[in-house]
């Protein structure tokens, strides 16, 4: 059997956002009809975000490289009422086979979500892992009205003082042996060999170096 690298990505992004972008591009020229379409798209986005998805990707690699299965966890944006995501992640941890975990940030959906975030990751911390942070690990989300898609608006001033408890989260992940790849490199030892990793902090908030 030819070795391949199997990248198993657990993506919890809102698939409805694709619909939102399409509707948003049309709304400006449709007046009230466009607003109605936008409302329908937003409603679908609200429904579909409750349906997390496990996606699988096969990445071809060199013949002599051992097969590795990577679980990626991204964009949880956790807040009260999303306990279904914790159940989903627990099911993934117990039913899927993977060799290592990569967490790519944006874990918080509210200021008080720290316990939920750590509960989400607890089933995975016994695996080799690495992580980077996203803007919603440093700064809590700012609610935005959907009408902002209809008109130009002045962007809010950039925040420079984090208000989310990212340091305790980072500490617990490091204590579990996970590698912090925020503007850093590192390695993970797997049964099939050593994996070299390189990461950056979030470029959208100018923390990459």
Where are these regions (language model features)?
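Beta-strand-turn-beta hairpins that frame and shape the catalytic cleft
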Residues: 58-71, 178-179, 185-197
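Charged, low-complexity N-terminal segments of organelle-associated membrane proteins
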Residues: 1-10
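Core catalytic region of metal-dependent phosphoesterases/phosphodiesterases
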Residues: 84-189
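Catalytic-adjacent loop/helix segments of enzymes that bind and process anionic phosphate/sulfate esters
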Residues: 197-209
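A mature extracytoplasmic/lumenal domain signature
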Residues: 135, 192, 199-201
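N-terminal active-site segment of His-dependent metallophosphoesterases
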Residues: 35-119
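Short hydrophobic segments within beta-strands
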Residues: 73, 104, 132, 198-200
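Hydrophobic alpha-helical topogenic segments used for membrane insertion/localization
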Residues: 13-44
């Amino acid at each position: 059997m030819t070795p391949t690298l199997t990248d198993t990505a657990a993506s919890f992004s809102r698939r409805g956002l694709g619909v939102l972008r399409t509707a948003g591009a049309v709304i400006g020229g449709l007046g009230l009809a466009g607003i109605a379409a936008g409302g329908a798209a937003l409603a679908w986005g609200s429904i579909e975000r409750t349906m997390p998805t496990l996606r699988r990707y096969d990445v071809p690699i060199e013949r002599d490289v051992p097969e590795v299965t990577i679980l990626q966890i991204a964009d949880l944006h956790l807040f009260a009422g999303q306990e279904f995501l914790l159940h989903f992640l627990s099911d993934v941890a117990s039913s899927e086979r993977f060799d290592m975990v990569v967490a790519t940030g944006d874990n918080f959906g509210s200021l008080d979500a720290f316990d939920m975030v750590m509960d989400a990751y607890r089933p995975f911390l016994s695996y080799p892992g690495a992580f980077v942070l996203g803007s919603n690990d440093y700064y809590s989300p700012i609610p935005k009205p959907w009408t902002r898609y209809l008109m130009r608006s002045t962007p809010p001033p950039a925040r420079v003082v984090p208000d989310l408890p990212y340091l305790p989260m980072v500490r617990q992940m490091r204590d579990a042996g996970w590698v912090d790849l925020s503007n850093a490199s590192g390695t993970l030892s797997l049964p099939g060999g050593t994996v070299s990793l390189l990461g950056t902090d979030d470029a959208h908030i100018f923390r990459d170096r």
